[in-house]
């Protein structure tokens, strides 16, 4: 399984896509790079409310306080959006996550303007859920 790119490489790769079809394919590819969740992790406690698709997000904290995010979805594009969000929050502490605004990154990628309203709402639900989980840890 290939590693996810960092924030800057994500932005570079995204800008190299010739059109939105290529960008969607890249997002789907990122989702395919996510490590699978175990059947036990596909539980009610990890499900994200407010997403049209099924979305599960697991948050762990290492001894140094850095958060590790893992997730899954039953929809390929949504799984890719999960990967994008995880890239933006990569190597952050719980406090960093609660303070970091991902929306400017979405604007740089012109992401939200090319998503359906239900996917945009689901993306916001994911961000709110991750920030809420991080706030409970910090």
UniProtKB/Swiss-Prot annotation:
Keyword presence, DNA repair: no
Subcellular location: Cytoplasm
InterPro entries for this protein: Cysteine_desulfuration_SufE, Fe-S_metab-assoc_dom
Entry's Gene Ontology cellular component terms: cytoplasm
Pathway it works in: Cofactor biosynthesis; iron-sulfur cluster biosynthesis
SUPFAM superfamilies in the cross-refs: SufE/NifU (SSF82649)
Similarity field: Belongs to the SufE family.
Function: Participates in cysteine desulfuration mediated by SufS. Cysteine desulfuration mobilizes sulfur from L-cysteine to yield L-alanine and constitutes an essential step in sulfur metabolism for biosynthesis of a variety of sulfur-containing biomolecules. Functions as a sulfur acceptor for SufS, by mediating the direct transfer of the sulfur atom from the S-sulfanylcysteine of SufS, an intermediate product of cysteine desulfuration process.
SUBUNIT field: Homodimer. Interacts with SufS.
Protein name as it appears in the record: Cysteine desulfuration protein SufE
Source species: Klebsiella pneumoniae subsp. pneumoniae (strain ATCC 700721 / MGH 78578)
Gene symbol of the encoding locus: sufE
């Amino acid at each position: 399984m290939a590693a996810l790119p960092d924030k800057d490489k994500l932005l570079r790769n995204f800008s190299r896509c010739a059109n939105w079809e290529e960008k969607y394919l890249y997002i789907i590819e990122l989702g395919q790079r996510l490590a699978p969740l175990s059947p036990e992790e596909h539980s009610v406690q990890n499900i994200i409310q407010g997403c049209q698709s099924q979305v599960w997000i697991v948050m762990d904290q290492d001894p140094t306080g850095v958060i590790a995010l893992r997730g899954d979805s039953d929809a390929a594009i949504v799984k890719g959006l999960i990967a994008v969000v995880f890239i933006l929050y990569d190597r952050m502490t719980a406090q960093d996550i609660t303070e970091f605004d991902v929306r400017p990154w979405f604007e740089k990628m012109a992401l939200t303007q090319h998503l359906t309203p239900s996917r945009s709402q689901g993306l916001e639900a994911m961000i709110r859920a991750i920030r809420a989980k991080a706030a409970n840890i910090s």
